[in-house]
From Swiss-Prot:
Pfam families: Tlp. Residues 1-20 are annotated as: Disordered. InterPro entries: SASP_thioredoxin-like. The gene is tlp. It comes from Caldanaerobacter subterraneus subsp. tengcongensis (strain DSM 15242 / JCM 11007 / NBRC 100824 / MB4). This is Protein Tlp homolog. Belongs to the Tlp family. HAMAP family: Tlp. NCBIfam families: SASP_tlp.
Length: 84
């Protein structure tokens, strides 16, 4: 693909029709990862260094924040759909 060809392509239209479904799937996957990490800690905590334990706990804290943000995004998307 040449430079000219790359810059003459039109941008894809903004299709938000499946955003809620995508967000729900992302929430599901994030919750699953959270639970797997919790289970891993329960089973292997004595084998892990304090740094590794803290790293896993920090990831899970970040996952909880992400879940909250994605849930808010779903609410925003639903409100946006209602306005259309």
């Amino acid at each position: 693909m040449g430079k000219e060809e790359r810059y003459t392509k039109k941008p894809k239209p903004d299709d938000r029709s499946d955003n809620v479904e995508k967000l729900q799937e992302m929430i599901h996957n994030t919750i699953e990862n959270y639970r797997e990490a919790e289970d891993y800690l329960k089973l292997h905590a004595e084998e892990l260094s304090p740094e590794e334990i803290e790293r896993i706990k920090e990831k899970n804290r970040n996952r909880l924040i992400s879940i909250q943000n994605m849930r808010q995004e779903i609410i925003d998307e639903v409100h946006d759909r209602e306005r259309r």
